[in-house]
Amino acid sequence: MSRPLRLEFLDALYHVTSRGDRREDIYHDDDDRQTWLNVLARVCKRCNWSVQAYCMMDNHYHLLVQTPDANLSAGMRQLNGVYTQLANPTHGRVGHVFQGRFKAILVDEDNYLVRSPI
């Protein structure tokens, strides 16, 4: 059975999270964190995203991202895919870095993030 398509909207604001496979660490050191930030910057430029906030935990991350062009899935595929391609050889790994699909919640209230535990 195929996955349901994600609904994406023009100029939407999303709270996005993605976790490490088997809840393992995504970032092992500051070089990994910088690599991920560099990939995120390239995705923002390519997809015309605006990141309002981010939080990098050892085994997952949170993004608050605005997508003027309704292209969240394409950008997330790029972000997680390119980071995986760069991180795996560095750490002698193959396979998944991230667990399943990213989670995205459409932010439609001013106080959404205030109520969101991290």
Protein language model annotation of sequence segments:
Residues M1-I118:
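Short catalytic/metal-binding and nucleic-acid-binding patches
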